[in-house]
Design a protein with these regions (language model features):
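Catalytic center-proximal scaffold of phosphoryl-transfer enzymes
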Residues: 1-241
Length: 241
């Protein structure tokens, strides 16, 4: 999924036969830029990218640690860690709408000290690594560099929630059509979802856009090098909106 700052949004689904590190490395071969993911280690072999972590995943782990507390308990390290994450998201909401350069500066001024304080506080704690709280601390320590790399550029986001949301339609659809019988079927589903979700991400009406493609695509002059340009979502006619 493209970053929120990109004018031309792309939601790209890709079927792979497994979750091994070779698949994202192959898929993203040649790409250079920022890559925001969860903490899955399979992305570690992707070359030429700057990894960004997801603060929503970390906050969720502290949320789980708070839920594991005895009934009525509202103090302790789990609550404090949760509060740090909540404060960070509150500041982010206040910075929404700022130009990237201003958001970059405000983050350094307001969020960098909070992050330094959070890390120092976490480093001073000793918790059982297999407990819910321990899992949150392990995630924080292992993912700290990706988690804080969003400070590098004001266009970047602190979570990959947008990508997570783009996955939801496919997950819901899969429950209805009960998976794919063959790899070719899975690949076809990935193509359809890529087209539809990219259309939605660019404020198009998916039905009207698909109708436009089905009616006009067969008549395209494929001898032209730029034959596909008129069909891209950002070049679609107004009646697709």
């Amino acid at each position: 999924m493209s970053g929120a700052a990109e004018a031309r949004q792309i939601a790209l689904y890709e079927y792979q036969p497994g979750r091994g590190a070779c698949y994202p490395a192959d898929f993203l071969s040649g790409f250079h830029g920022y890559l925001q993911t969860d903490g899955y280690d399979g992305y570690n072999d992707v070359k030429g990218v700057t990894r960004l972590g997801c603060w929503a995943h970390l906050r969720r782990k502290f949320d789980e640690a708070v839920k594991a507390l005895p009934k009525g308990a509202r103090t302790g390290a789990a609550v404090t860690g949760q509060a740090y994450c909540t404060k960070l998201f509150m500041i982010e909401r206040e910075l929404q709408g700022l130009p990237p350069e201003n958001r970059y500066e405000e983050r350094l001024k307001r969020e960098k000290p909070l992050l330094d304080e959070f890390r120092a506080w976490a480093d001073a704690r000793t918790v059982a690594p297999k407990s819910k709280l321990g899992q949150a601390f392990v995630y924080l320590a292992n993912q700290w560099t990706p988690l804080t790399n969003y400070l590098l550029d004001g266009r970047l986001e602190i979570s990959n929630n947008r990508a997570e949301r783009s996955i939801k339609p496919f997950v819901m659809g899969r429950k209805n059509f009960l998976f794919a019988n063959t790899p070719r079927g899975a690949q076809a589903s990935a193509v359809i979802y890529s087209v539809m979700e990219t259309a939605k991400a660019n404020a198009l009406d998916p039905y009207r856009y698909l109708l436009f493609l089905l009616e006009e695509f067969p008549n395209a002059d494929r001898r032209r090098a730029d034959w596909m340009e008129p069909f891209l979502p950002w070049n679609a006619p107004d009646d697709c909106r």
